[in-house]
Amino acid sequence: MSVRRRTHSDDFSFRLERTRRPSKLDVLRESPTLPVQQGYSLTTVVLVSLVVTLVCQNVAPPAFSYLNQLIKNSPKRKIPGQSNRLNIGFISTNSPEKFAPAVQKPTFLVDPIYDEKWKGVHTAVPVMTTEPEEKRDNNHAKVKEAILAAKAASRSRRDGNLERAVTIMEHAMALAPNNPQILIEMGQIREMHNELVEADQCYVKALAYDPGNSEALVLRARTNPLVSAIDRKMLKTVHDLRNEFAHLQHSTALRRMMRETYFLYVYHTVAIEGNTLSLGQTRAILESGMVIPGKSIREHNEVIGMDAALRFLNCSLLSKEHHEISIDDILEMHRRVLGNADPVEAGKIRTTQVYVGKFTPVAPEYVLEQLADMVDWLNDESTMAMDPIERAAIAHYKLVLVHPFTDGNGRTARLLLNLIMMRSGFPPVILPVETRAEYYASLHVANLGDLRPFVRYVAKHSEASIQRYIGAMKTSSGNVINGEEPNLTAEESKVSEKIETECRAGS
């Protein structure tokens, strides 16, 4: 009998048999039969679901709120090796240590932000603007280019090439109109052209943006007395024309010119505010009540309201015995200005905050107080002793600055200006719509602290208004000198009689 030799494969099979995991079939064969477990009933499942829902709705939220409150009020501890993910305030340049809560707030989402310590904390500086970085870089590049252009213009100015200097500075002013260095160089070029008023304005504007600029202070001290003398001479010229106007013969030609000025004033004062009616259309509305096709009802009502306000000024305010101006006078003018366009807000001080471009007037709770201060200033003895042109211009500016109404502030301010001027013997001042940009620019300069440009603007157009009357009287007809007067048309006579009748009834 042969005996088979044991091989390595037999050993491997033996080990595999010993280490093999029992299969499910082997377990079933060896283990006794177990009873099958029965499932839960439907009633039990429903009851458990209701209990879980009630717990989630009533117990879980207060528990999480309490936990969040504990985390919020927990003491803070320093973690030298960590940095805050959000840094709301200015970045500290002294200490690199950051603060983190002692108990971390639990989160149910994976934070996708990789939190790495910022290595530039010691060299950081606060960012003082909210402009986009691209815009800041663009503005910085413009200012840099403007300064280089100003240096080139300065070299041309010293070499005597003023034309080239002016051309370069116009480019620099277009790039950085508010830069003090640019304004100072532009002022020096204006001064060399003997444009002292414009040069002084450049120095004043430079000081508004940089009050401590020594070069601007020295240059302003040189031009200020010269410009003051120019302003006094200009005001004296206007007063001399006013005296000449006062001695004009009250003829039919003068009355006709007054009627034309009336229509011109209504047209220009509403056109400055954006009204698109032409002078002929404005006149047609006032004379015949015609409705202009293609124009809004509001534009018609603005013209009618200004007509009512002018009649109130001519027939009531100018006939008052005392020359004091009250808050009620201003409110009554405004009530007529907006009486047809916006009767709800007409004659009422605003109760909401308004915004005029980049300018923000006073809050509504201070409007009445500011308006009372303005009226007290108007009626003060020292103010009454001022030049009427200066007083009227400053009163206009103060009313616009307070901005007491939601709409119609500019029209009411121009009525107040003319009320003061006409009480001093001046004819109505027309501020043309063609000079709208100059009008608002001079008011902007007044916001920077210099009222003289706006006073000059009012004086210039007051002189133009008087010259219009004098020129009309001199060129209308030679019959006025001989005592003969041209006859009015039937329509002109009818309108003049209507205005005079209304004035007598109002007084």
UniProtKB/Swiss-Prot annotation:
Give the O-AMP-threonine positions (modified residues): 351, 475
For this entry, the protein name equals Protein adenylyltransferase fic-1
Please give the superkingdom of this protein's source.
Answer: Eukaryota
What keywords are assigned to this protein?
Answer: ATP-binding, Endoplasmic reticulum, Hydrolase, Membrane, Nucleotide-binding, Nucleotidyltransferase, Nucleus, Phosphoprotein, Repeat, TPR repeat, Transferase, Transmembrane, Transmembrane helix
Q: Please list the reactions this protein catalyses.
A: L-tyrosyl-[protein] + ATP = O-(5'-adenylyl)-L-tyrosyl-[protein] + diphosphate; L-threonyl-[protein] + ATP = 3-O-(5'-adenylyl)-L-threonyl-[protein] + diphosphate; 3-O-(5'-adenylyl)-L-threonyl-[protein] + H2O = L-threonyl-[protein] + AMP + H(+)
Q: Name one GO biological process term.
A: defense response to Gram-negative bacterium
**For the Fido domain, which residue ranges apply?**
325-460
The UniProt function text for this chain reads:
Protein that can both mediate the addition of adenosine 5'-monophosphate (AMP) to specific residues of target proteins (AMPylation), and the removal of the same modification from target proteins (de-AMPylation), depending on the context. The side chain of Glu-273 determines which of the two opposing activities (AMPylase or de-AMPylase) will take place. Adenylyltransferase that mediates the addition of adenosine 5'-monophosphate (AMP) to specific residues of target proteins.
Q: Which residues form a coiled coil?
A: none
Q: Where are the TPR repeats?
A: 146-179, 180-213
Instruction: Report the residue ranges where the short sequence motif Inhibitory (S/T)XXXE(G/N) motif is annotated in this entry.
Output: 269-274
Q: Where would you find the membrane-spanning parts of this chain? A: 40-56
Ranges of compositional bias, category Basic and acidic residues: 491-507
Per the record, the domain comment is: The fido domain mediates the adenylyltransferase activity.
Q: Which organism is it from?
A: Caenorhabditis briggsae
Tell me which InterPro entries the record gives.
Fido (IPR003812), Fido-like_dom_sf (IPR036597), Fido_containing (IPR040198), TPR-like_helical_dom_sf (IPR011990), TPR_rpt (IPR019734)
- Binding of ATP occurs at 273, 356-359, 407-414, 439-440, 447
